Regions:
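Catalytic-site microenvironment of enzymes
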Residues: 22, 70, 449
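Active-site-adjacent loops and short helices of periplasmic peptidoglycan-processing enzymes
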Residues: 29-216
Length: 449
């Protein structure tokens, strides 16, 4: 083999090796340590990159029904929100109208364009059917028809019922404490004739979703997998319209329901609710994802991240055992100079459900000094567990054996021993020992199991 060929082969092998090394490294291109966990950046918390979700979405949030936020990515930045706008459309409609009411489709609704269920001018349908088409298939035509009908109910004297409805959307937004949201239409279109300043934030959209989710009627539409809706044509004939379920993870891995959205500026959007035991429900919203599959993959990643970072933290942990149970501590028996009493956990199964990225978990062991007679199982201390300074649980410590005080001869021997200890500068009684330990929470959660 000539030298030129050898050199070329060597260069090729080196390049292949480097490429293999690069590909072998885990890719975290969409994992950001600037993302917030419980309001603090992952970097400030010292959270390892592998503990964070890898998502394509540019804006995202995970929020509990009580409003506590567990994860944020640019959640308070103003963005286009596409058809997640329709969550507020449904909420305002249910605030002011009964689902059994009948509405009529006008020319504006029938010709709005883009994602539509196929309504025609003059069609009539119940608000219930309209809300089904709104939440299941994201119909812009039903959104417009709803706005005109409900606006007329809000202010029968208004010459612009559509505008009245938009004002009601923004008034409701203010009531919910949203910080940066403006609605300009009931469907979320943001291009062509609809170019404007309609915007919100991931946080605000989730606030709106959480409020709507409290409404039982809204949940029935948001959770619906209906494949058709029913209308009456202008000539009085009944007509069924096929529906495509936009939420492709409905019923999967705990997804109870949601609302999709998509425009060029907003990207792929989704706001939804999951429920998995024992944590229960949580709301998730994301915006600016890539492609329909990417949107739902991101959503499932966030759900798995949230639920995967909860774990049962066992309290009764120790490197030592006595009688087959964990040894928590040894307590000083003050009537004796050299005796210690084994203390075990009163409830060996005691545990607390914790969010493993929620901050430092600490234990405080308090051991009583024992004097006199004690039966086995006597309370003799406790271990209290805190996370970020808040108590998450405690467990009582009890004596593993009986304790008898010294008789007269034993007492004299103890006094003599203490005299010797005094000259040797040793303590008059044996010193307590602590064996209870705190497991690393991240070692027991399911995120990277």
């Amino acid at each position: 083999m000539n030298k030129a060929l050898q050199a070329a082969l060597g260069t090729a092998l080196t390049a292949a090796f480097v490429l293999f090394a690069i590909l072998a490294e885990p890719a975290y291109a969409d994992v950001l340590l600037t993302d917030l966990v419980l309001g603090t950046s992952a970097q400030e918390r010292g959270v390892a990159i592998e503990e964070m979700p890898d998502i394509l979405a540019t804006h995202a949030i995970i929020m509990r029904p009580d409003g506590s936020v567990y994860y944020e990515r640019e959640a308070d930045s103003p963005i286009k929100i596409a058809s997640t706008t329709k969550v507020m459309t449904a909420l305002v409609a249910l605030d002011h109208c009964d689902p059994s009411e009948t509405l009529t489709v006008d020319h504006a609704a029938a010709t709005v364009g883009e994602s539509c269920v196929g309504l025609k001018e003059g069609d009539t349908l119940t608000l219930e059917q309209a809300l089904t088409g709104l939440m299941v298939m994201s119909g812009n035509d039903v959104a417009t028809a709803i706005a005109t009908h409900v606006g007329g109910k809000i202010d029968p004297a208004s010459a612009d019922p559509y505008g009245t409805f938009i004002k009601a959307m923004n008034d409701r937004t203010a009531q919910l404490g949203c910080t940066d949201t403006l609605f300009e239409n009931p469907h979320g279109l943001d291009f062509g004739a609809w170019v404007g300043n309609l915007h919100s934030t991931a946080h605000d959209v989730t606030r709106i979703w959480a409020e709507a989710w409290r409404n039982e009627a809204f949940r029935s539409f948001a959770c619906s997998g209906a494949t058709e809706m029913h209308v009456t044509s202008a000539d009085g004939s009944a007509r069924s319209l096929p529906l495509t379920v936009r939420n492709k993870i409905l019923g999967r891995d705990g997804n109870l329901g949601g609302k999709t959205g998509s425009t060029y500026e907003a990207g792929e959007c989704f706001v939804c609710t999951f429920s998995r035991e024992p944590e229960g429900e949580v709301h998730i919203a994301l915006f600016g994802s890539k492609g329909d599959e990417g949107r739902f993959n991101d959503t499932l990643t966030l759900a798995n991240w949230y639920y995967g970072h909860f774990a049962n933290l066992p309290f009764a942990t120790s490197p030592k055992q006595v009688g087959g149970v964990p040894l928590a501590a040894e307590a000083a028996c003050v009537d004796w100079s050299d005796k210690l009493m084994d203390l075990t956990f009163a409830d060996a199964d005691a545990a607390a459900r914790v969010f493993t990225l929620g901050g430092t978990i600490e234990q405080k062991v308090e051991v009583d000094e024992l004097r006199g007679k004690h039966a086995a199982g006597t309370a003799a201390g406790s271990v209290t567990y805190t996370q970020n300074g808040e108590t998450i649980g405690s467990v009582e410590l009890t004596t593993a054996n009986e304790l008898e005080p010294p008789n007269l001869l034993e007492w004299l021997a103890v006094q003599l021993d203490r005299l010797v200890r005094l000259f040797e500068d040793k303590p008059a009684t044996a010193e307590e020992r602590i064996y209870a330990t705190m497991p690393d929470p991240l070692s027991i959660d399911e995120w990277n199991a």
